[in-house]
Amino acid sequence: YYIEYTIESLDVERLEQMINLVISKNDALRLIVTHEGKASFLDNVPYYSVPVYSLYDGNDREQKRLERSHHRYNYYKWPMFHFCVGKTSGKTSVLHVDFDCIILDAWSAKLLLNEIFSLYYGKDVKFPRISFMNYMRLKTDKGDLEAEEYWKEKVKNRPSFPKLNYQKKFAEVQNVR
């Protein structure tokens, strides 16, 4: 997922603070995938710094757009999103935003960006009082918990995945779109 915004008189430091606030309130922005293929939500992540580059002409913008719109994330490492700002010689800035769709679909990304911009422009944003994970735990009844424990035990004793022969190693595959 990639989108960019042209913004006049952008305060990058304020934007960065609002992005970090939203990261702290949103489990999906703290998600990584373990080597076992399970989602893991990090409790603590480093402060996210928004890189800034000089935007001299349309070619710089196009180059950044091409780079970010085709970026492939490492699922085992945080973050799986990227914000950066191109600054012109005037007051115009370009905010480039991309996410891996494993953490957010387009609707969720739009909602998240609306939260960031609302906070940036001083509007009040109501964040959920509990995380999605805690909400799901509250909704789960005792029978579901027993069933979950049963299946966790079953999964521990399942056979390993089959070894598949590939024409190339995944690391050798290039230009995937």
Where are the language model's segments positioned?
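Short amphipathic
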Residues: 3-6, 51-54, 177
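Flexible, P/S/T/G-rich "lid" or insertion loops adjacent to the active sites of thioester-utilizing
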Residues: 147-177
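Acyl-group handoff/entry surfaces in thioester-processing enzymes
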Residues: 1-43, 57-141, 156-164
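Short, charged/polar, Gly/Pro-enriched secondary-structure boundary elements
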Residues: 43-51
